[in-house]
Amino acid sequence: MMDLFPDALASACLQQFRATPPLVHCLTNEVVQSFTANVLLALGAFPAMVVEPQEAAQFSTMANSLLINIGTLHRARAESMLSAITAANQAGTPWVLDPVAVGGLAYRTDFARHLLTLKPAAIRGNASEIMALSGMATMGRGVDSVDTSLAALPAARQLAQRTQTVVAVTGEVDYITDGQRDVAVTGGDKLMTRVVGTGCALSAVVAAFCALEGDRLHHVATACRIMSQVGGQVSQHVAGPGSFVPAFLDGLYQLETLTY
């Protein structure tokens, strides 16, 4: 069995994050913008969502990291994303790709595969998305995955090796790999799948942690630990999706340490 990501490393990364809270430029989908911003704020980061192409490029040189989420992709948004990524790469700003619903739709799949050539610092997706991005057959259904994260781990490793990045494939168990090293993160709750935007918000947290100096595999794994731990804890004390969201934000705000 793969080793779980250690508490001590996760807690150290969280302390580093709290000491240097990043400014995160989020080019994310229109369904989840408010929730994503609130998750980052609850953790202590600073979100911004600048979408006009010229401004997106300018702001990416000011931010500490950039999120590219293609959930509600259209051509104008794609232009903004390419402008932001180009500027981020020139400035040395790390950026994260969330390849929402790739595989089933041609335009976004082609666009996401082009983005792979632009050197993302990390990629975060569900099993079907990661398998599709790597070129493997999947059983995805829109933004949802029918494949398991463990089944997608070989694809994640291959994708990480090919793109020289960290890949997080998330599900009942999250697996994070740089193509050579793998770590696992457990926790969370099925209730999280009944709330729009938990995966997209995780990608924003991954982007925030990619702003930190040090071992990027550990930083991405810590982002997954945070969302899984708080989500799992909160789910035990709420009645359903409606009460989950405010309790989840409170849990992120109050988070001090990471323990299984």
From Swiss-Prot:
Pfam family, one: HK
Residues annotated for substrate binding in this entry: M49, G197
Residues at which ATP binds: R124, T170
Membrane spanning stretches: none
EC number: 2.7.1.50
Gene3D superfamilies assigned to the protein according to its UniProt record, in alphabetical order: 3.40.1190.20
CC cofactor: Mg(2+)
Biological process according to GO: thiamine biosynthetic process; thiamine diphosphate biosynthetic process
Keyword set includes Nucleotide-binding: yes
Catalysis performed (reactions): 5-(2-hydroxyethyl)-4-methylthiazole + ATP = 4-methyl-5-(2-phosphooxyethyl)-thiazole + ADP + H(+)
Associated pathway: Cofactor biosynthesis; thiamine diphosphate biosynthesis; 4-methyl-5-(2-phosphoethyl)-thiazole from 5-(2-hydroxyethyl)-4-methylthiazole: step 1/1
GO MF annotation: an example: hydroxyethylthiazole kinase activity
Keywords: ATP-binding, Kinase, Magnesium, Metal-binding, Nucleotide-binding, Thiamine biosynthesis, Transferase
HAMAP family reported in the protein's UniProt record: Thz_kinase
Function comment: Catalyzes the phosphorylation of the hydroxyl group of 4-methyl-5-beta-hydroxyethylthiazole (THZ).
Homology family: Belongs to the Thz kinase family.
Name of the protein: Hydroxyethylthiazole kinase
Organism: Yersinia enterocolitica serotype O:8 / biotype 1B (strain NCTC 13174 / 8081)
Lineage: Bacteria, Pseudomonadati, Pseudomonadota, Gammaproteobacteria, Enterobacterales
